[in-house]
Structure formats: C-alpha cells, structure tokens
C-alpha cells in the first residue's frame, strides 16, 4: 500500500452534498474501514479515490504525487493511480471463465504470458479458488464470485486495494 491523503474533498450530486470537507490520511501499511448507514458517502469516497468520480473541491495525493486538484481541474486518470477497486457487484465478465476474468487486465497491460500465468496462479492460490479456474461466473456462488473479483484486483499488484462492501457475502 501507499500513503494516501485527501484534503477538503467536497462532492455534490446536484444539490445533494454527499461528501463535505472530507480530509483523511491513510499511512503505508494501514487498514482502514469506512462505516456508516446507507447513503452516507462510503461508496462515493471510494469512487473519488479511484478516479471514477470527480469532486468539486479538494485535493488528493498518493505517495506525495497529486492525483486530484479540483481548484486546478486536475484529475489523474484512474489507470495512473496504481490502485484497484472491487465493486459491490463484483463486475465479472459473464462470458469469461475465472482464468479469463483474472487475466484480462494483465493482458491489457501487455505483460508477458509467463508473468500473466504466474500472477494468475498466485491470485488463485491466495484466494483459495484454484479449482474454479475453468468455471464461468454463473457457475459460482456469490462468495466465490467475490473471491474471483478480489483475485483479479490483486493480480495486478496494486499499491492500494479498495473494497466496496467486502463482507456482503
């Protein structure tokens, strides 16, 4: 993981002020949990950090590198942030096997085949889902699908891993 710092983040959806002056620092090696009732901004916070949402105010750095500066309308692309987000819905490709789902992003990065295979099998082993490698998402339980989504996120060796509703299954 890396040091991440958010300062004075504001996010609106229309007139709805979802994130109000959010400031937090997560140090390298920390584990942080966002707790709160439905609709309080937990998922929005993850989406801002990951680059899927742009706040109206505030800044964010990862390891001292600016990722968000709303005043300057600067927003680093999600692919430049060195992180992965596992969605509550898992977002698995239904027409791809577990192998293909986990390997997809690694192929997009144009990694060598032997490196893709190494990372694939390491992620499968870490999540204890080796026996599902040739199955499709609809052949898996919700908990198994969740582990595939986490394995896919871990396979790219992110500096930061964001999990939305990780205990839902």
Model feature map: region roles:
Residues 1-169:
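ABC family nucleotide-binding domain
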């Amino acid at each position: 993981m890396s040091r991440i710092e958010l300062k004075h983040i504001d996010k609106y959806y229309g007139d709805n002020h979802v994130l109000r002056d959010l400031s937090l620092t997560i140090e390298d090696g920390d584990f942080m949990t966002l707790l709160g009732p439905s609709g309080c901004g937990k998922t929005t916070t993850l989406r801002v950090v990951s680059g899927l949402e742009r706040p109206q105010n505030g800044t964010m750095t990862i390891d001292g590198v600016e990722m968000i500066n709303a005043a300057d309308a600067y927003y680093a692309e999600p692919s430049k942030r060195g992180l992965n987000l596992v969605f509550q819905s898992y977002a698995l490709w239904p027409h791809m096997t577990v192998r293909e789902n986990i390997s997809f992003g690694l192929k997009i990065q144009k990694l060598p085949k032997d490196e893709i295979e190494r990372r694939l099998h390491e992620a499968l082993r870490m999540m204890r889902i080796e026996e599902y490698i040739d199955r499709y998402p609809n052949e898996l339980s919700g908990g198994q699908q969740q582990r595939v989504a986490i394995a896919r996120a871990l396979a790219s060796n992110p500096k930061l891993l964001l999990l939305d509703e990780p205990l839902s299954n």
